[in-house]
Amino acid sequence: MKKIAIDAMGGDNAPQAIIEGVNRALASFKDIEIQLYGDQEKIKHYLESEERVTIIHTDEKIDSDDEPAKAIRRKKNASMVLAAKAVKEGQADAVLSAGNTGALLAAGLFVVGRIKGVDRPGLMSTLPTTNQKGFDMLDLGANAENTASHLHQYAILGSFYAKNVRGIAKPRVGLLNNGTEETKGDPLRKETYALLSQDPNIHFIGNVEARDLMSGVADVVVADGFTGNAVLKSIEGTALSIMKQLKSSIKGGGFKAKLGALLLKESLSDMKHSLDYSGAGGAVLFGLKAPVVKSHGSSDANSIYYTIKQVRTMLETNVVGQLSEAFSKETISND
């Protein structure tokens, strides 16, 4: 039985969206147990059944405007902190939260802990592509500054995840740069390019540009945390803007526009699906001793369900255990 610790009070729509997502996951997956950390009365209001559910009551939670490191130290009984401690103490196998991103990163690093040999765990998410296959990108903001060695390690981590969780036999790894030529980029990108080119364990395809990411140019895209976070926000904003503009044009275009939308309903639905990243789950702080997964702060029940599904797959494939073993045996170089 896979035990997942969930911060029931984290996120804009907590606890309702969290618990409704849990209800659906419990109905779909009979091999999971859920530990819910938060206000017991509020949790029970939305919970359909307590079968395979344990509620750990706490009145304390970490707010979105709390300073991450201080919040982890001072709010020791916060729902997020208790969920992370459950993983550290072996009471749960993974932790999930839609709360304060910085605080979850801090809890992951300082409570759950890094895999030995991993210098900087990276925040990774599966983002949408027009071919609906998606691509994994890291770092998405766990670290503002990185070295070439860190980016090399992100390529290793991303490849490992793509193989073991997403089932891609030979993941194509691209380095995000301002051009595809080998000579492009600043010293960080050039040094990283050299490291990735020399690693036989990585299927490195070279530099990739931001404009090509959503066309599926690579299965894994490596970037420093600052750049990765900027690209993530750009992709999210672009997808939202496209859908908003389409709705506005249809509503304001009169009868012909509405008729056209009706005729193109299936195609528009496919396009919306291709731009929707919620079905891929949350962002993984990859490189820790257990799965620590961040769902979007505005997640609805559907997003929470898919994030639980993602965590279940990570546990089912034992991707963290395999990664830890690989690093401990030094079969993967992180020099």
From Swiss-Prot:
<dbReference type="GO" id="GO:0005737">
    <property type="term" value="C:cytoplasm"/>
</dbReference>
<protein>
    <recommendedName>
        <fullName>Phosphate acyltransferase</fullName>
        <ecNumber>2.3.1.274</ecNumber>
    </recommendedName>
</protein>
<keyword id="KW-1208">Phospholipid metabolism</keyword>
<dbReference type="InterPro" id="IPR003664">
    <property type="entry name" value="FA_synthesis"/>
</dbReference>
<dbReference type="GO" id="GO:0006633">
    <property type="term" value="P:fatty acid biosynthetic process"/>
</dbReference>
<keyword id="KW-0594">Phospholipid biosynthesis</keyword>
<keyword id="KW-0808">Transferase</keyword>
<dbReference type="InterPro" id="IPR012281">
    <property type="entry name" value="Phospholipid_synth_PlsX-like"/>
</dbReference>
<comment type="pathway">
    <text>Lipid metabolism; phospholipid metabolism.</text>
</comment>
<comment type="function">
    <text>Catalyzes the reversible formation of acyl-phosphate (acyl-PO(4)) from acyl-[acyl-carrier-protein] (acyl-ACP). This enzyme utilizes acyl-ACP as fatty acyl donor, but not acyl-CoA.</text>
</comment>
<keyword id="KW-0444">Lipid biosynthesis</keyword>
<dbReference type="GO" id="GO:0043811">
    <property type="term" value="F:phosphate:acyl-[acyl carrier protein] acyltransferase activity"/>
</dbReference>
<dbReference type="GO" id="GO:0008654">
    <property type="term" value="P:phospholipid biosynthetic process"/>
</dbReference>
<keyword id="KW-0443">Lipid metabolism</keyword>
<comment type="similarity">
    <text>Belongs to the PlsX family.</text>
</comment>
<dbReference type="Pfam" id="PF02504">
    <property type="entry name" value="FA_synthesis"/>
</dbReference>
<keyword id="KW-0963">Cytoplasm</keyword>
<comment type="subunit">
    <text>Homodimer. Probably interacts with PlsY.</text>
</comment>
